[in-house]
């Protein structure tokens, strides 16, 4: 059966205006105002075509003591393979929560397969000084391997501490401490990535340090 569906980049045109196409690798959480359910409408209203790759379906985010967790790992490669066979291309990749180490491997494969011009990595692993229940030390080490592939990383301070082996500190962090944390992350990135920390700031305008 022959399809008349055209998957070329001209499908990203509407009335002559270019519509960027973003692949989003992230979970779907039913409760908690996070992940794909929040990101998709926000990015879509910015006139970007969002193409989700679900990593898991959760009853709620992992900050709660209980959670129904439906792992999608076994489907992800087949899902992505079809995109590749259709000849789809993407102007960017946004990666959020990854439920296990194998999903990190799949993200690496996605980057190698599609070569997105822009890769934003949100290394979702914890909050308020604690790793989420599903996050192991092996997971943290594997996440470090993704950092050099990303153009932008957006860890909160908890995740930055996990990635750099920095002890968690309760209370406010000084700009000097945060700058030091960003420099540690820049060393892990090994590229001209832009770093953004989003937790425990009085002045959010100071939360981005460009390491280029």
Regions found by a protein language model. Name each.
Residues 134-212:
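Conserved phosphate/ATP/ADP-binding segment of small-molecule kinases
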């Amino acid at each position: 059966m022959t399809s008349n569906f055209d998957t070329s980049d001209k499908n990203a045109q509407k009335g002559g205006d270019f519509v960027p196409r973003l692949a989003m690798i992230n979970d779907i959480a039913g409760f908690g105002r996070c992940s794909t359910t929040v990101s998709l409408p926000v990015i879509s209203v910015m006139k970007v075509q969002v193409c989700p790759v679900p990593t898991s379906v959760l009853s709620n985010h992992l900050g709660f003591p209980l959670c129904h967790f439906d792992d999608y790992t076994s489907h992800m490669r087949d899902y992505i393979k079809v995109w590749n066979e259709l000849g789809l291309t993407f102007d960017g990749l946004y990666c959020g929560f990854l439920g296990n180490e194998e999903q990190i491997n799949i993200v690496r494969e996605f980057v190698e397969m599609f070569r997105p011009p822009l890769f934003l990595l949100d290394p979702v692993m914890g909050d308020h000084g604690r790793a989420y229940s599903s996050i192991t030390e092996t997971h943290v080490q594997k996440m470090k391997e993704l950092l050099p592939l990303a153009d932008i990383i957006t860890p909160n301070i908890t995740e930055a501490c996990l990635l750099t082996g920095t002890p968690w500190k309760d209370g406010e962090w000084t700009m000097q401490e945060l700058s030091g944390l960003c420099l540690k992350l820049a060393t892990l990135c090994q590229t001209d990535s832009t770093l953004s920390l989003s937790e425990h700031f009085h002045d959010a305008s100071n939360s981005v340090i460009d390491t280029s």
